[in-house]
Amino acid sequence: MINAKKMLGDGKEGTSTIPGFNQIQFEGFYRFIDQGLIEELSKFPKIEDIDHEIEFQLFVETYQLVEPLIKERDAVYESLTYSSELYVSAGLIWKTNRNMQEQRIFIGNIPLMNSLGTSIVNGIYRVVINQILQSPGIYYQSELDHNGISVYTGTIISDWGGRLELEIDKKARIWARVSRKQKISILVLSSAMGSNLREILENVCYPEIFLSFLTDKEKKKIGSKENAILEFYQQFSCVGGDPIFSESLCKELQKKFFHQRCELGRIGRRNINWRLNLNIPQNNIFLLPRDILAAADHLIGMKFGMGTLDDMNHLKNKRIRSVADLLQDQLGLALARLENVVKGTIGGAIRHKLIPPTQNLVTSTPLTTTYESFFGFHPLSQVLDRTNPLTQIVHGRKLSYLGPGGLTGRTANFRIRDIHPSHYGRICPIDTSEGINVGLIGSLSIHARIGDWGSLESPFYELVEKSKKAQIRMLFLSPSQDEYYMIAAGNSLALNRGIQEEQVVPARYRQEFLTIAWEEVHLRSIFPFQYFSIGASLIPFIEHNDANRALMSSNMQRQAVPLSRSEKCIVGTGLERQVALDSGVPAIAEHEGKILYTDTEKIILSGNENTLSIPLIMYQRSNKNTCMHQKPQVPRGKCIKKGQILADGAATVGGELALGKNVLVAYMPWEGYNFEDAVLISECLVYGDIYTSFHIRKYEIQTHVTTQGPERITKEIPHLEGRLLRNLDKNGIVMLGSWVETGDILVGKLTPQVAKESSYAPEDRLLRAILGIQVSTSKETCLKLPIGGRGRVIDVRWVQKKGGSSYNPEIIRVYISQKREIKVGDKVAGRHGNKGIISKILPRQDMPYLQDGRPVDMVFNPLGVPSRMNVGQIFECSLGLAGSLLDRHYRIAPFDERYEQEASRKLVFSELYEASKQTANPWVFEPEYPGKSRIFDGRTGDPFEQPVIIGKPYILKLIHQVDDKIHGRSSGHYALVTQQPLRGRSKQGGQRVGEMEVWALEGFGVAHILQEMLTYKSDHIRARQEVLGTTIIGGTIPKPEDAPESFRLLVRELRSLALELNHFLVSEKNFQINRKEV
């Protein structure tokens, strides 16, 4: 936990701890279990049969969730769901004799949340992300029409996202728009909702305006409720003629209009009461005539210049749809399906004169399948990204504008994507995705939490003057509350108590940023990085970087691969420990005790009169193929305290996040090998296993029962060389510990097939006729190791489902570990958006070296710094060098300039000066060019002309590795329509020669290469076949005569538009045209 003392200028102000990073997910799931379940179960209606003799009902007070029988780890390996069974008491009541049969019944499984804040569904870790939606309520806006006149509208948004728009025209008539083309008078709508004219005029502030557009025709329409409903129905459903009033017409209108557009919900009722100054009870969640009339009054006031317009992008007008809301919606859907099942079962039982027991009326299928399909297919339920510990923890804190009821990447405008002042302390202004979803997927700030009404709350210190002594208390404010306070920014200069009265501070008030006197401040921020997300808070010296580069850095830290030997960063921000702890990657002691035994698989701890065995994760594959592994950190016999680290996980060291390595870097050009973000590295990084990582790939095969018989797993595979089968055991499955190469058989499998007599080869028929040998009719369908898959087999799993039918096949999974050193084509990055690709690996002796003889590890291009304005990397680089020489680690909170001007530079120079004195190396800090040093060319031994910045920044190796990207194709599949090669590595696709590539080839005048690209290698079917033949037998390749397939396709498409394409040959001699069809 980070202490908030000193960061705020005064040590007496108390401390503040950062909340758990998984807390948002846990609180949401707890709210669903504690409140949402009961709410939805209590809505389940009493179900009666047609004759009203039997009644079925649920007693929700006694619901019970049973602890899962399976462990999390087993659920992952066996592709099962980690869920809890839900039991509820149900009663079947006979109304004739008032007898009741009560029984505890099982109604389905609910997936549980684990300690990481995720769920395991079908063996896959999934996380539900929070969605930002427009909050239900009423919003007033004005737009200019084509004449440049302001048109005022009031939009009522329902809980379901449906909209009802009120608008006022230039004659001051008020209309309710029910569709894009249809609108009806406000009087008709109010009458249809049950008000008469007298009530309407009594409940409005401007009755004369309402009377002004009351014509005789209008009076007839609102003469009775039935007339108003008929008029409304006619306009809403666009029905011609004269419809007749009936009960079914009312029901249809209720279902299509009032339920979708007038259900406000709990939040909507509160918002409308607050906006229109009403006092309607909270349990009244539907739109009332009173609301409509108050909204119309407000709209008239707007027309006459009273009242304020609403900012739709302000966070007070948004609500967060959390895990609890999404799971509760799904439970409601499942119970509605269950209701239909129970009705059908009761009806069938009565017809057959049977009275089934209570459990037989209910099936668990609706609930179980609803949740499985939600976690499997809902856009807000995503596969947990487990590249490294940071990625796991950040994924659950995402906020998305996308998803059902939200926006799409194509329709969202710039104003929605932009940063809004109300995001301060709630949504990170930096951390968002790049590309089409920029600004639509954000990340929660560190201290933000979701309030009871679905609003995002942020904490502030309140300054209370009490007997001339300032007292501090912490408040959590929603976006609608903090508008009324002057809030001092936490990154302002530290306040000197002596001259406080004279100081002015930057502050925020009503969405504006001002500079005000200290006495006027009501609240102040509690942390300097309160408004950043976790990813952005891990960037040291972030205040010296351009925001675009900080955005790239927070995204790239999530792509860092855990290395085989992790290392703590020398320069950090102080959040690294909490990120590691909350990610659940290190093993932590649950109580104090003594270590009895430790090895790579488990740690045995004794304490509190019991012995606890803590299993460790060994070579577990994440869904990004990275290796999750725990290493014990405590010796046998050691006494430990509760909360102490027992074992480090992937990318953690001593309980701190460790994503990369501190390497010696020089910023200088080197023979053009670091042009345009390329990076030159020393071979020490390869041979020293500095950037070596382990990757685990999973290959699986299923065995089905076909119509010809079951498929067989066997080692006896005819027609295959013994070399390919060398690693199989007697069952036909690869042995643990085997080294396998591309093309090797991992699982031998034969699929039976029917063979006709005519399909046998002549020699096979001869063998059958003479010797009576039965020729094999099985087809070889083995699991082979694909290209680029070499490695060591570390695990084999044979998952046998119950009742191995064709729908429930057996699955064999083989896990292969690969050791990957860093190589040319891999991507590396710092923590300031400074990314690059390895262009060359130089021998150690050729690398530039320092004045103490040490060769540098990496050479970056200095031109990558000034134009991109990420100067933080220079501070980190120099301070890292000082830290490595002094053997110190620095944890620096951002915005340290609040203490004094140029604080970062002073800190770096003072540490370099101290390192220079302690190590007696004057080159570490040379006053003529501080931070730079003269270094030597490794090839010649001569010094370079200019002094160069050298240092030890923290550099990460990213998951974009050349082994996963490199691809070649000689021949492969073609698209059916265009007959051109497919696209993409996974489909063995080709490389596209587009329009600009054709221009380049034309520019060089390479006619033959260009013709090959457009014909043989692409979509000329006959020429392709001829090339293959002539290549085998030798000879000249024939030239393609006719047009390629894509041109034929163009001709066919033109024909479908009734356009015939012809071309003509014009004779040079007599200019006669010879017509010839294409």
Swiss-Prot record:
Gene Ontology process terms (BP): DNA-templated transcription
Coiled coil start-end: none
Enzyme class: transferase
Keyword annotations of the record: Chloroplast, DNA-directed RNA polymerase, Nucleotidyltransferase, Plastid, Transcription, Transferase
Compartment(s) of residence: Plastid, Chloroplast
Record GO terms (molecular function): DNA binding; DNA-directed RNA polymerase activity; ribonucleoside binding
Signal sequence coordinates: none
Catalytic reaction annotation: RNA(n) + a ribonucleoside 5'-triphosphate = RNA(n+1) + diphosphate
Any one GO cellular component localisation term in the record: chloroplast
Main location (coarse class): plastid
EC number: 2.7.7.6
Assembly information from the UniProt record: The minimal PEP RNA polymerase found in etioplasts (PEP-B) is composed of four subunits: alpha, beta, beta', and beta''. Following differentiation into chloroplasts the PEP-A RNA polymerase in this organism has been shown to be composed of at least 13 subunits, including the PEP-B subunits. When a (nuclear-encoded) sigma factor is associated with the core the holoenzyme is formed, which can initiate transcription.
Anything else known: A second beta-like protein with a slightly lower molecular weight has been purified with the PEP-A polymerase as identified by mass spectrometry.
Function (record text): DNA-dependent RNA polymerase catalyzes the transcription of DNA into RNA using the four ribonucleoside triphosphates as substrates.
Family of this protein: Belongs to the RNA polymerase beta chain family.
Protein name: DNA-directed RNA polymerase subunit beta
